[in-house]
Structure formats: structure tokens, C-alpha cells
């Protein structure tokens, strides 16, 4: 059986994907074997020694390290082994077009994968601790959003999760005790969300109408109730000494940008 060796100086996922896509075109007559972390001349020699018959194998390489890549090509030529270097020509072409020297960093795709999984983890975190009654996540959150109902806490948590940021949100209500954990974490992580009372009343009444709960004077959308809640939330935010953002008619993206600039002012997201 013909074998394709997917060789890389990182985990080899890109090389294996290319090899699998190639092998797929030839059914069961081609087998793929991943050979990761080829970073030394010795690693190259060990690989070459495995291939006994050059007519029954080839190498697909995504090695970025120049000296190792060139040595592998040299050894393949000496041994009569066919090799396809996937990244080399692409890197060279882009380098020529941009007139810029590449950094030759192995594992770029793996770094992208890590970012992807970080987003997934942040998304799961946001969903788990949405309007959280479970306060155990407060100490593990990158950002804690606090505010009244209908102040965009949930959509902000989801938006931030898409940036790989673990955001937890806690609703503030006069009848519900404020979690003690809020007073035990870095205040910089806490973001208070406030809103114009008339705008909040309008949003809540619209919500009530959609839920077909009449009359709109229902406590949830009652003007006096809303003012009481806003006063309560303001007291809590002042007590926490946290940053407060007015979300009145502000887009989620704009609010999120302010939050990220505030919390991560010392680093780039």
C-alpha cells in the first residue's frame, strides 16, 4: 500500500489534512501517517530511515523552519523519495509580493485552533452563567456585567464570548441579595450597565406586550418600579466603585468596545 507521510515541525494537522484530501482521491489504496515535531536533523534522518521503498511512499511537508525544510528536501533527493512542500512556495510567493521577510513560525494553525477553542470555552461560560444564580463563576470570569433586566447583559456576554472573553452577568434586583463574591474580585473586572429610565420603561413595555401580558402597568414595566430599580443599581455600583456604562440607544458593539478598552487597557484583545 502506498503511504503518504504528513510531516511537520508542529503538530502536523495542516499536513495531515492535505494528505487526507489527497489520499481520498485514490480510495483505500493510499494510507496517511502523521509525523509531527520534526525539528532537528536527527528527526529528519529518522524519518528517511523509515521509508524503505521510495516507490511506495511520499512526504507532504508543512515544515516552516528553513534549515530543517532544506535538509529534508536534500535527504529526500538523496534517497529518491518524492516530497511536496505545501507551505514553502506559498510563503515565498507572499514574501515576494509584500517584499517582506516571513517570520517562519511553526504551529500557526495550532495557534488559530487555540483561539477557536478559547471562543468555544468562553461561549459555554457565558451560557452557563447567564443571569447567574450560580456565583461560583465570578472569580473565574474575565468580565462581570451587572445591571437591571433589559440592559443588554446577555447579548454583551455572548458578543464578548465571541472574542474569547469569559463574561458573566448578574441581574440587580432590590429583592435579591448582591453576591458577596463581587466584593472579593478586582473592581476593574466589574462593569455596571445603566440606562435612561424612560427608554427602559419603553423596552420593558414592549417586552410585556410581546409576552401578551396586559396591562402594561404590570410591575415589571411600571415607571415607579423602574426608578426604584435604577436607584438600587446605582447604589450598588457606587459601592463597588466599578466603571458604569450608559447603554441607552447604544449598539452592542460600541458598548463591548468600551468594556474591552476599560478592562484590558493594558493589553490588546
UniProtKB/Swiss-Prot annotation:
Instruction: Give the molecular function GO annotations.
Output: ADP binding; ATP binding; phosphotransferase activity, phosphate group as acceptor; protein serine/threonine kinase activity
Q: What class of enzyme is it?
A: transferase
Q: Which UniProt keywords apply?
A: Kinase, Nucleotide-binding, Serine/threonine-protein kinase, Transferase
S-adenosyl-L-methionine: present as a keyword of the record?
A: no
The signal peptide here is: none
Task: Decide whether keyword Nucleotide-binding is in the record.
Answer: yes
Question: Which PANTHER family does the UniProt entry name for this protein?
Answer: PYRUVATE, PHOSPHATE DIKINASE REGULATORY PROTEIN 1, CHLOROPLASTIC
Q: Which NCBIfam families match?
A: PRK05339.1
What does this protein's UniProt record list under function? Bifunctional serine/threonine kinase and phosphorylase involved in the regulation of the pyruvate, phosphate dikinase (PPDK) by catalyzing its phosphorylation/dephosphorylation.
Per the record, the similarity remark reads:
Belongs to the pyruvate, phosphate/water dikinase regulatory protein family. PDRP subfamily.
The protein's name in its UniProt record: Putative pyruvate, phosphate dikinase regulatory protein
Could you tell me which species this protein originates from?
Clostridium botulinum (strain Hall / ATCC 3502 / NCTC 13319 / Type A)
Amino acid at each position: 500500500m502506498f503511504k503518504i507521510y504528513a510531516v511537520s515541525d508542529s503538530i502536523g494537522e495542516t499536513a495531515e489534512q492535505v494528505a487526507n484530501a489527497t489520499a481520498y482521491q485514490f480510495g483505500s489504496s493510499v494510507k496517511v501517517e502523521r509525523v509531527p515535531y520534526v525539528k532537528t536533523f536527527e528527526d529528519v534522518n529518522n524519518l528517511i530511515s523509515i521509508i524503505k521503498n521510495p516507490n511506495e511512499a511520499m512526504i507532504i511537508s508543512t515544515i516552516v523552519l528553513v534549515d530543517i525544510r532544506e535538509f529534508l528536501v536534500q535527504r529526500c533527493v538523496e534517497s529518491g523519495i518524492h516530497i511536496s512542500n505545501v507551505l514553502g512556495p506559498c510563503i515565498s510567493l507572499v514574501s515576494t509580493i509584500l517584499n517582506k521577510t516571513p517570520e517562519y513560525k511553526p504551529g500557526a494553525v495550532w495557534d488559530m485552533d487555540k483561539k477557536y477553542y478559547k471562543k468555544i470555552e468562553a461561549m459555554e461560560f457565558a451560557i452557563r452563567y447567564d443571569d447567574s444564580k450560580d456565583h461560583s463563576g465570578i472569580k473565574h470570569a474575565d468580565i462581570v456585567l451587572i445591571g437591571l433586566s433589559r440592559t443588554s447583559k446577555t447579548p454583551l456576554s455572548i458578543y464578548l464570548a465571541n472574542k474569547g472573553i469569559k463574561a458573566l452577568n448578574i441581574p440587580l434586583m432590590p429583592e435579591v441579595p448582591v453576591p458577596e463574591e463581587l466584593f472579593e474580585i478586582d473592581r476593574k473586572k466589574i462593569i455596571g450597565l445603566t440606562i435612561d429610565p424612560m427608554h427602559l420603561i419603553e423596552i420593558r413595555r414592549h417586552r410585556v406586550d410581546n409576552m401578551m401580558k396586559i396591562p402594561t402597568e404590570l410591575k415589571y414595566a411600571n415607571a415607579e418600579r423602574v426608578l426604584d430599580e435604577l436607584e438600587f443599581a446605582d447604589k450598588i455600583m457606587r459601592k463597588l466603585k466599578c466603571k458604569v456604562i450608559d447603554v441607552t440607544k447604544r449598539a452592542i458593539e460600541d458598548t463591548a468596545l468600551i468594556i474591552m478598552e476599560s478592562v484590558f487597557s493594558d493589553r490588546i484583545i
